[in-house]
């Protein structure tokens, strides 16, 4: 059985720990902070076997060197082959190597090319779990620091095509703020209203809203539904000074991301 555990880091990061029972060797996803990972390993008598990196931002990679030293340079470190990340031992290209196997893990690890937030961002799927870094958030998506709106839209559409029961393990607890924006854009969405109430209740108890599921995100995430009639109407109303005669899905998505950036 694969167990997935969250380690909180910084203000709102999640570092995900993957453990295939009964093994005591584990993998971590995007360890921006080594100290919290080491504390978790030692408290649970676990050994770190490897690291999965989604992109180069320091809050996702900052702990790699210290964890490698802690593990006496025995770690396998996976990450995108077209981003400058110190410490990667196994650079990945999703086109050339879309699947691989990990020691101590059952089944294959699928690698997805999801540029947008950064130019080389990748995501991982193992069993029914998606680790998508800063590409897809619950109720939102990542800012476009390096990629284009077209790249991000394509990446999100790719993720939205995963099986509905796929669990979404993003890297930040941004759900509450994302849902505020989603409700401004899509106020009559009952599924969104219900999810917002659940998210508020969870955060009041200091509990994580993650993981989400692909099914839920298809229903409530405006960035997966940029061509929905109510969302298109909201975009046109918000950007009323623009000519929307030929507004297509990419144009709507671009304006939606611009709106969120200034929300």
Swiss-Prot record:
Pathway where it operates: Secondary metabolite metabolism; methylglyoxal degradation; (R)-lactate from methylglyoxal: step 2/2
Known function: Thiolesterase that catalyzes the hydrolysis of S-D-lactoyl-glutathione to form glutathione and D-lactic acid.
Alphabetized InterPro entries for the sequence: Clx_II_MBL (IPR035680), Glyoxalase_II_hydrolase (IPR050110), HAGH_C (IPR032282), Hydroxyacylglutathione_Hdrlase (IPR017782), Metallo-B-lactamas (IPR001279), RibonucZ/Hydroxyglut_hydro (IPR036866)
Subunit: Monomer.
Keyword Nucleotidyltransferase: no
Residues reported in the UniProt entry to bind Zn(2+) 1: 55, 57, 117, 134
Enzyme Commission number: 3.1.2.6
Keywords: Hydrolase, Metal-binding, Zinc
SS bonds (residue pairs): none
Binding, Zn(2+) 2: 59-60, 134, 172
SUPFAM superfamilies given in the database record: Metallo-hydrolase/oxidoreductase
Main enzyme class: hydrolase
One term of GO molecular function: hydroxyacylglutathione hydrolase activity
Cofactor: binding comment: Binds 2 Zn(2+) ions per subunit.
Cofactor(s) of this protein: Zn(2+)
Catalysis performed (reactions): an S-(2-hydroxyacyl)glutathione + H2O = a 2-hydroxy carboxylate + glutathione + H(+)
The keyword Transferase appears for this protein: no
Family to which this protein belongs: Belongs to the metallo-beta-lactamase superfamily. Glyoxalase II family.
Pfam families assigned: HAGH_C, Lactamase_B
Organism expressing this protein natively: Shewanella baltica (strain OS223)
GO biological process, one term: methylglyoxal catabolic process to D-lactate via S-lactoyl-glutathione
Protein name: Hydroxyacylglutathione hydrolase
